[in-house]
Every structure is written in structure tokens, then in C-alpha cells.
Amino acid sequence: MRIDNRELDQLRTVTFERNYTKHAEGSVLVCFGDTKVLCTASVEAGVPRWLKGKGQGWVTAEYGMLPRATNTRNQREAARGKQSGRTQEIQRLIGRSLRAMVDLTKLGENTIYLDCDVLQADGGTRTASITGAAIALIDALEVLQQKKKLKADPLIGLVAAVSVGVKNGEVLLDLNYEEDSSCDTDLNVVMTQKGEFIEIQGTAEEKPFTRAEADKMLAMAEKGIADLVKLQQTALGW
């Protein structure tokens, strides 16, 4: 039994509240336990310069944390004048993951920005961001279709993400902050709804992990992501 009385392979309570804000084409408040992230999808006509004239669109992401999302206040990155390496890494991960959902050649010369703002952090902010932003992206695509801006549906399928870790020889799913900060090893795994891997980020924090442990972590992540996809589908009314 874990710190919060979950089973080893049990997700935290996961919820999605769609249409959380009124201006964005898609907006979702996603909660993984006490981690809460507001994910908004904004559509803008046009694409980055390096894509102009190629007849395709673009999906990108930005990520940030509110100053008091954590136990002590952090200065806003805008006030510091630059983004941290962590922020840049996470928003690139989110963008890569969400581009796997869309056939960019069917998006037209439109850009969809996914903004993921962490309201409260208790571990797994990047995985919650990906999982919530996937729903916001689908809602934004629906708006484009309703406005007759697309000739064909560009959606390929859902993606979701979850963390796994090894602590005292046991594999744990969906780590909260206390678990994440004390694990021997942790992975962040992103997959499609078909069970294909998009990204695997893994680090041995305290001691190296074996191939057998890696296989166990990936198997547990696969199960967790399948459960997350079902929750996404329920939230979407599919």
C-alpha cells in the first residue's frame, strides 16, 4: 500500500472539466489527484515561416506554473526574463506528443497552440498536461470543422501520458510528488490510444535499473494509459 493508500498499479483520481474557460477554442481543467492543470487550445490562422507554402498546419505547446503552484512561491519566469531548461523541455515534450494526434497535412495553414498552466503541482504535471491538452485539442479541431475551416478530419487518435517509478523494488503507477522525489527510478511514458509509444523518458535517480524493471514499468504504464484513454473517451462522450 502506498502513501495515499492506492494500489501499486492504481491511478490517482483523474477528472477532466471541458469548456473551463469561454474564449479558447478548447479548454480543459485536468486533475490527477492534487495536480491541477488548465489546458487551453487556441487556433490561429497561419503557420511558422519555415512551413509557409507547404500546405500543412502546426501544433505546438507552452507550459508554465503559477507562482504558488508549489509548496513555496516561485518567481514567474516572465519576471526572470527567461524560461528554465525544465520548462523548455516539458513544453517541447507536450508539443511532440500532441502532434502525434493530428495529420498536419489536413489541418490547413493553421496553428493550434496548447497552453498548459499548472495551478497546483503534486507530481506528474507534464503527464497531466499531455493528457488534458489532448482533449482541448480535439475540442479545437471540432470548432474548426464547425466553421468549415477544414476539408477533412485531421484527427488520428488520442494520446495520454503517465509516470511510473521503482521504489524499494516495487513498481508504482502515477507518482505523486512525495513518491516522485523519493523513487529510485522514474519514467514518463506517452502513448497513443492504439498502444504505440510516442516518448519514454527515464532516469535512474538513486540507482541503475534493470531491463526486467524497465519492462515492468513499461507494462504498468501501458495499463495506466489504457485506463486514461477510457477516461478521456468518457469525458468526450465517445
UniProtKB/Swiss-Prot annotation:
Record function comment: Phosphorolytic 3'-5' exoribonuclease that plays an important role in tRNA 3'-end maturation. Removes nucleotide residues following the 3'-CCA terminus of tRNAs; can also add nucleotides to the ends of RNA molecules by using nucleoside diphosphates as substrates, but this may not be physiologically important. Probably plays a role in initiation of 16S rRNA degradation (leading to ribosome degradation) during starvation.
EC number: 2.7.7.56
Binding positions (phosphate): R86, G124, T125, R126
InterPro entries associated with the record: ExoRNase_PH_dom1 (IPR001247), ExoRNase_PH_dom2 (IPR015847), ExoRNase_PH_dom2_sf (IPR036345), PNPase/RNase_PH_dom_sf (IPR027408), Ribosomal_Su5_D2-typ_SF (IPR020568), RNase_PH (IPR050080), RNase_PH_bac-type (IPR002381), RNase_PH_CS (IPR018336)
Top-level taxonomic group: Bacteria
Pfam families: RNase_PH, RNase_PH_C
The family this protein is said to belong to: Belongs to the RNase PH family.
GO term, biological process aspect, one: rRNA catabolic process
Catalytic activity: tRNA(n+1) + phosphate = tRNA(n) + a ribonucleoside 5'-diphosphate
Keywords from the named record: Nucleotidyltransferase, RNA-binding, rRNA processing, Transferase, tRNA processing, tRNA-binding
GO molecular function: 3'-5'-RNA exonuclease activity; tRNA binding; tRNA nucleotidyltransferase activity
Subunit structure: Homohexameric ring arranged as a trimer of dimers.
Name of the featured protein: Ribonuclease PH
Amino-acid biosynthesis keyword on record: no
